[in-house]
């Protein structure tokens, strides 16, 4: 694994290259995705069937075949191993408990002059969840997307997942059963996003679409934004690690690889203040690579998008990591909590050597749907508020409009909005 020192003459350029590699360019697939969306809008279910036959390699003979039945979900749940059931329920309970703490409250404030101001928090009516599918389906993604919607109080949750060769992952169906999902469809890719955004004869139009996916899914979400709300536009997985001399290289190495094995495009960056830790971690990465079932993918990721940076101080290391703004950030230092106030940008922050990133993927409780590509500078993890909206509440008494009305009318006058001003003054005249 390549080691870069911040004292290198060309470090600035090397670091800019690292940042550039983390970006996802969707331009190359935009025209393809636009065509897919147009076909769904124009032809609905017929286009869905054609896309499934083309991309997932099975023939849909009726509209009914697009939907996954609740009976299938229940049977899948009953068929899985008891220990897996227990693990899914543990994850469900922990995720739900965490997200319940995020719920904002409606509020009302009464002023002395009789003004009543407030905020009303309301869930969206219908949420669409995109869940990657096929044999390598991720039931954890279903839990992480469905539970915040459930906690928010969304009345109708729609799930779309691809089913290559008409195969649906049993664990994913079991997770659907645990979450009480009633509408799930065998539709994937940009087609699924378009179907949920615009609706078809079978798939209802939703208000918000969340969930991870490949570049086609990400592009589709970007293109339908405005027709519906979306959570974020996520790219390949990322991990950043801050380490000092106390960090164990074997922990650092396997944690870097935990993201590298996801995808050849995944990014794994460690910044340390200890050159010996950097060298030993690089050696451990190579040792672990040879033991992985997805060695080829992980090796390509580490070679193309992995790096160990040796910084001159922890402050410099944190400054660089804030610039990277990684999806996942592990802090393996002697004083991880003391560094927390200085960390500004990361999707999720894992403190201490006993908190590897996979803990957050499955069982800790916080959401694992996180911003990538440095968008943690302005995006948050998926949360309950993605499924909520807020309305302002305003009520003026006679006394309140008498006190504040003329100021309001004057501001309207300055903007040349005569009807606005008259709307207030006609009431002042009556009073």
What do these predicted ranges mean?
Residues 1-125:
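N-terminal Rossmann-like NAD(P)+-binding subdomain of aldehyde/semialdehyde dehydrogenases
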Residues 109-174:
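Conserved small-residue-rich beta-alpha loop and adjacent elements
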Residues 2-7, 183-188, 308-313:
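Short acidic-hydrophobic, aromatic-tinged amphipathic segments that line or gate anion-handling sites
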Residues 180-251, 255-267:
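Conserved NAD(P)+-binding/catalytic subdomain of aldehyde/semialdehyde dehydrogenases
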Residues 323-431:
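C-terminal core of ALDH-fold dehydrogenases
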Residues 232-304, 308:
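A conserved active-site cap/scaffold subdomain adjacent to cofactor or substrate pockets
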């Amino acid at each position: 694994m390549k080691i870069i020192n911040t004292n290198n003459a060309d470090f600035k350029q090397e670091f800019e290259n690292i940042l550039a590699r983390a970006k996802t360019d969707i331009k190359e697939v935009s025209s393809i995705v636009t065509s897919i969306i147009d076909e769904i809008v124009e032809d609905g279910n017929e286009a869905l069937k054609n896309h499934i036959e083309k991309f997932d390699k099975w023939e849909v003979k009726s509209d009914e075949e697009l939907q996954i039945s609740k009976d299938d979900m229940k049977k899948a749940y009953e068929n899985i191993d008891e220990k897996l059931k227990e693990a899914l329920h543990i994850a469900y309970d922990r995720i739900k408990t965490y997200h319940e703490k995020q719920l904002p409250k409606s509020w009302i404030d009464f002023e002395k002059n009789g003004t009543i101001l407030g905020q009303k928090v309301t869930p969206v009516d219908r949420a669409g969840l995109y869940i990657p599918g096929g044999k390598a389906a991720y039931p954890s993604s279903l839990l992480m997307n469905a539970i915040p919607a459930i906690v928010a109080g969304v009345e109708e949750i729609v799930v779309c997942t691809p089913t290559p060769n008409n195969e649906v992952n049993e664990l994913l169906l079991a997770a659907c059963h645990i979450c009480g999902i009633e509408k799930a469809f065998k539709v994937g890719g940009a087609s699924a996003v378009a179907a949920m955004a615009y609706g078809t004869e079978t798939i209802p139009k939703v208000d918000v679409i969340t969930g991870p996916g490949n570049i086609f899914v990400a592009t589709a979400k970007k293109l339908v934004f405005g027709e519906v709300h979306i959570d974020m536009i996520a790219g390949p997985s990322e991990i950043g690690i801050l380490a000092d001399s106390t960090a164990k290289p074997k922990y650092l190495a396997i944690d870097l690889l935990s993201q590298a094995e996801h995808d050849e495009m995944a990014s794994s960056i460690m910044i340390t203040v200890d050159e010996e830790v950097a060298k030993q971690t690089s050696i451990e990465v190579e040792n672990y690579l040879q033991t992985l079932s997805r060695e080829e993918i992980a090796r390509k990721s580490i070679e193309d998008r992995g790096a160990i940076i040796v910084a001159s101080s922890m402050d410099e290391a944190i400054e660089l990591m804030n610039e990277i703004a990684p999806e996942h950030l592990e802090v393996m230092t002697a004083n991880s909590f003391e560094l927390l106030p200085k960390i500004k940008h990361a999707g999720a922050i894992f403190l201490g050597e006993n908190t590897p990133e996979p803990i957050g993927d499955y069982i800790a409780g916080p959401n694992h749907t996180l911003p990538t590509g440095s968008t943690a500078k302005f995006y948050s993890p998926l949360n309950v508020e993605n499924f909520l909206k807020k309305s302002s509440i305003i009520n003026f008494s006679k006394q309140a409009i008498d006190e504040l009305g003329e100021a309001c009318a004057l501001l309207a006058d300055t903007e040349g909005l005569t009807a606005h001003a008259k709307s207030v003054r006609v009431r002042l005249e009556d009073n």
